[in-house]
């Protein structure tokens, strides 16, 4: 009976360790996809698409300041 209890406890701890490591690996994969994903790379170029010939350099500078924390 003691060996069965020990075996059950061991399996529960093993399953907990596997699920925790899976969540950790998933979080790392999610972070990497956010950093290197296509959407993230496109979002870094937002100022490139704001170019309008009628805007002055001061206007662009003001827009960049406004978009810094967006």
Swiss-Prot record:
Tissue: Expressed by the venom gland.
Residues carrying Phenylalanine amide: 36
Gene Ontology biological-process entries: defense response to bacterium; regulation of defense response to virus
Endpoints of the signal sequence: 1-23
Subcellular location: Secreted; Target cell membrane
Keywords tagged on the record: Amidation, Antibiotic, Antimicrobial, Antiviral protein, Cleavage on pair of basic residues, Membrane, Secreted, Signal, Target cell membrane, Target membrane, Transmembrane
Family membership: Belongs to the non-disulfide-bridged peptide (NDBP) superfamily. Short antimicrobial peptide (group 4) family.
Stated name of the protein: Peptide BmKn2
Native source species: Olivierus martensii (Manchurian scorpion)
Classification lineage: Eukaryota, Metazoa, Ecdysozoa, Arthropoda, Chelicerata
């Amino acid at each position: 009976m003691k060996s069965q209890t020990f075996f059950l406890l061991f399996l529960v701890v093993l399953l907990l360790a596997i699920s925790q490591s899976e969540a950790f690996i998933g979080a790392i994969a999610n972070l990497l996809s956010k950093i290197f994903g296509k959407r993230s790379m496109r979002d870094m170029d937002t100022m490139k698409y704001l170019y309008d010939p009628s805007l002055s350099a001061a206007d662009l500078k003001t827009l960049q300041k406004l978009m810094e924390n967006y």
